[in-house]
Each structure stands twice: as structure tokens, then as C-alpha cells.
UniProtKB/Swiss-Prot annotation:
The protein's name: Bifunctional protein GlmU
Record's subcellular location: Cytoplasm
Active-site residues (renumbered): H336 (proton acceptor)
GO biological process terms held by the UniProt record: cell morphogenesis; cell wall organization; lipid A biosynthetic process; peptidoglycan biosynthetic process; regulation of cell shape; UDP-N-acetylglucosamine biosynthetic process
Protein family (similarity comment): In the N-terminal section; belongs to the N-acetylglucosamine-1-phosphate uridyltransferase family. In the C-terminal section; belongs to the transferase hexapeptide repeat family.
Binding-site positions, Mg(2+): D102, N221
Organism: Campylobacter jejuni subsp. doylei (strain ATCC BAA-1458 / RM4099 / 269.97)
Region named Linker: 224-244
UniProt pathway annotation: Nucleotide-sugar biosynthesis; UDP-N-acetyl-alpha-D-glucosamine biosynthesis; N-acetyl-alpha-D-glucosamine 1-phosphate from alpha-D-glucosamine 6-phosphate (route II): step 2/2; Nucleotide-sugar biosynthesis; UDP-N-acetyl-alpha-D-glucosamine biosynthesis; UDP-N-acetyl-alpha-D-glucosamine from N-acetyl-alpha-D-glucosamine 1-phosphate: step 1/1; Bacterial outer membrane biogenesis; LPS lipid A biosynthesis
Length: 429
């Protein structure tokens, strides 16, 4: 049976206390709504999102990554609430999966289990450790009797710890029949989607409760819950990669972006941050290093190194306090305290301490190209654009602003001068 998916993302998100819409808050370097959409499109080709607050901003983010998403707009002024969000929604398939845009931890396998039940109305529920302000689910004879919103629950109903996760699977025809019957006769004067349970019961529809994991189905409403959710996601990411053979030393101290990939035998030490679409292949990343959108193959990086975006390292050693950006390094050694930006450096080359590629003139950036088996002495500056051919020696303390031919020695120090007894003349009273 084919399924249409509707994601509710029209809320104001005031508890997040941010100018950024709630569903655009990031977990592991990806917006909440994008986490949900990835799982939704894995299950269906008919996916819609309901927006309202900062609609244009959220819509732009969604369509940039998932251009086939259908965007709907909720009239919050006249039809507030979760049922109000469904006005104008026309599913293409026989049933509808309704999700919340602030549930980025939900796994595809859990949604598949929910869809595996053939009841006309299924809802995800969980046993809450702390029921807080969740809607309470009253279950009787293996079926759902009703859902009571916290604001409308009496003292006895508030003692129930079976709570509504806010995720539903409903027959499309049943939804079309019952949705117009939902009113706003409640404390909040909102149109509650939960009322569809009561209406379905009145028509003797069997309603099935599917128990799910509370942590996985948590809704994120503020920055504290955002941090909790990101910790959960980090644990999942690192657990997955450890099961694939990656070694993490003190994994709780490292941050791995959701789009990062590891290949082969890799080792990651404490306090490392790897983000973007970085790919680490058979490499060691040592303590307190940062890697952003870069490829590292058969190399070791760090400690205390920084690979900014668009670096590609192969068979290379990058030591402490070395920063690279937009750098292609093949079998290179850069042991310490250097900046290598907008450059290509070939095999066998050694970069001395304090080397800088001066790539920016205040308007435009330029490239430094260094060939094979070049020895670069300490405290060297390359004034780009500049090309150093193979088997060149650059003397320590050089400022290189011209191309250097193969096999040459480059040196441009000024002559030295020694003034005897100068110290005593300057400081003697």
C-alpha cells in the first residue's frame, strides 16, 4: 500500500528563542527538517510540508535539498492547531503518514514498523519517564479509546504515562471524511488532530497504538532539548562508525558531522571535530584537530591541526598548528606551524616550520604550486601566484615572489651586519 507523507512544520517555535525558525535549527550540521525529509523520501515519493512562520526562508532550505517536496501554507490566524495544518492537503496515495518537523531522531525502521500495521488509524505512543505536557493516550481492550491534550486533561488522566508521540498513519479516505468534523471547542481554541481519534471511535474504526522509543520520537522545543537530541545523534553516528571498524579514543569528546564518511581503518583521538562532507580513508586524526569538508587518505593529521574546506590530502603528514585551506597535498610533510592555503604541493616535498602561502592581496586569491622533492626552509613566505618546480631548495627565511626553475637554490636574505659593543652603548648609563 502506497503512502503519502505530511510533515507539520508551521509552528512559531517561540520557546527556541531564536530568529532562526525552529525546524532550521541544526543537529550535527543539518537542519531538523532535512533530517526528517531524508527519511520521508526514503519511504515515499509524495512528501508535503506545511509551513507558516518564516515560510519563504524554510521553503528555500527545503527545496534546495529536496526539490520534489510539496509546500503547503497553514492559515494560523483562522485555523490554528495540528488539524488546521491539514486544510488543503490532498494525498495522492491510499494512506497518509503524518510527522512532526521537530523530530529529527526518528529512524526509518521505526516508521516502517508503524506503516506495517494495516489498521485504518495507527498512532505512535510511548511510555513517558516524565509525562510533562504530552497528550495522554487512553487505551482499552488493545485499542485506543481517546487522546486527551494536557490542557484539557483532568487529574486522573494526567496520571496516565502513555503519551501521544504526534505521529499518525491514517487511511486517506477516512482522513478526508473526518477532518471537516474537527472543531476548536477546547481550552486553546485550536483544531486538534488528536480529535480524529474520538471521531474515528464514533464510527467504530479500530485504532491501533504502536509503542515507540521515547528518546527517538522526542520533539525539540528549546535549546536544551536541542542539545540533548544532538548528543543522542552523536552517539548513534559514532556507534555506527565504530561498528564499521573506526577507532575513537574518548568518543564522547569528539564531534562527527552527519554527512562525514570513513573508509577502511581509521583512528580518531580525543577532542576532534570532523564536519561537512569530509571523507577519511585509512587515516589517523590526532587530538584537538578540526577537519571541514575535506578528504584525507592514508595520512595523519594533528595534533592541533586545522583543515579548512576543500583540502585533499594523500599519503601526507600534517603536524601541530598547521592550517590548510583549499590545498591539494600529495605525499607531503608539513610538521608544524604553517599556513598552506590555495596551493598544490607534490610528492616528496618538505614544508619547514613557519611557512606561509600568501594567497590574498585584499581583492583576489592566488595559487601557489610546488613540485616534487622540494625542500622549503623554515620561515618562508610564498607570494602567490608563484610556481616552484621540482627538486628546488628554498633557503630558510626567504620571501619567494618569482617562479623558481627545477634544481635551483632560492635565497634572498639581505647581507648581515654586526656592530660590536652595541648593547653597552644602548643600555649603559
Amino acid at each position: 500500500m502506497k503512502t503519502s507523507i505530511l510533515i507539520l512544520a508551521a509552528g512559531l517555535g517561540t520557546r527556541m528563542k531564536s530568529q532562526k525558525p525552529k525546524v532550521l535549527q541544526e543537529l550535527c550540521q543539518k537542519s531538523m527538517i532535512l533530517h526528517i525529509l531524508k527519511k520521508a523520501f526514503a519511504l515515499s515519493d509524495d512528501v508535503s510540508v506545511v509551513l507558516s512562520h518564516q515560510k519563504e526562508r524554510v521553503e528555500k532550505e527545503i527545496l534546495e535539498h529536496f526539490p520534489k517536496t510539496q509546500i503547503l501554507e497553514q492559515d494560523l490566524q483562522n485555523y490554528p492547531g495540528t488539524a488546521g495544518a491539514l486544510r488543503g492537503f490532498e494525498p495522492k496515495n491510499e494512506r497518509v503518514l503524518i510527522l512532526c518537523g521537530d523530530m529529527p531522531l526518528v529512524e526509518q525502521t521505526s516508521l516502517e514498523a508503524l506503516l506495517g500495521n494495516n489498521a485504518k488509524l495507527n498512532l505512535a505512543v510511548f511510555k513517558a519517564r516524565d509525562s510533562k505536557s504530552y497528550g495522554r493516550v487512553v487505551i482499552k481492550d488493545d485499542g485506543v479509546e481517546k487522546i486527551v491534550e494536557f490542557k484539557d486533561a483532568n487529574a486522573r488522566e494526567r496520571e496516565i504515562n502513555t503519551c501521544n508521540a504526534g505521529v499518525y498513519v491514517i487511511d486517506s479516505r477516512l482522513l478526508k471524511e473526518l477532518l471537516p468534523l474537527i472543531d476548536n471547542n477546547n481550552a486553546a481554541k485550536e483544531y486538534y488532530l488528536t480529535d480524529i481519534v474520538k471521531l474515528a471511535k464514533e464510527k467504530d474504526v479500530m485504532i491501533k497504538a504502536v509503542f515507540v522509543d521515547e528518546d527517538e520520537f522526542m520533539g525539540i522545543n528549546d535549546k536544551f532539548e536541542l542539545s540533548i537530541a544532538e548528543n543522542f545523534m552523536q552517539e548513534k553516528i559514532k556507534k555506527y562508525w565504530m561498528q564499521q571498524g573506526v577507532i575513537f579514543h574518548l568518543p564522547q569528546s569528539t564531534f562527527i558531522g552527519v554527512d562525514v564518511k570513513f573508509v577502511g581503518e581509521c583512528e580518531v583521538y580525543e577532542n576532534v571535530r570532523i564536519g561537512g562532507k569530509s571523507k577519511i580513508i585509512n587515516s589517523i586524526i590526532k587530538s584537538s584537530s578540526v577537519i571541514e569538508n575535506s578528504i584525507v587518505e592514508n595520512s595523519d593529521v594533528g595534533p592541533l591541526a586545522h583543515l579548512r574546506p576543500n583540502c585533499e590530502l594523500k599519503n601526507t603528514h600534517i603536524g601541530n598548528f598547521v592550517e590548510c585551506k583549499n590545498a591539494n597535498l600529495n605525499a607531503v610533510k608539513a610538521g608544524h606551524l604553517s599556513y598552506l592555503g590555495d596551493c598544490e604541493i607534490d610528492s616528496g616535498t618538505n614544508i619547514g616550520c613557519g611557512t606561509i602561502t600568501c594567497n590574498y592581496d585584499g581583492v583576489k586569491k592566488y595559487k601557489t604550486i610546488i613540485g616534487k622533492n622540494v625542500f622549503v626552509g623554515s620561515d618562508t613566505q610564498f607570494i602567490a601566484p608563484v610556481k616552484i618546480e621540482d627538486e628546488v631548495i628554498i633557503a630558510a627565511g626567504s620571501t619567494v615572489s618569482v617562479n623558481v626553475e627545477k634544481g635551483a637554490l632560492f635565497i634572498n636574505r639581505t647581507g648581515h651586519k654586526i656592530i660590536k659593543n652595541y648593547y653597552y652603548k644602548k643600555f649603559q648609563k
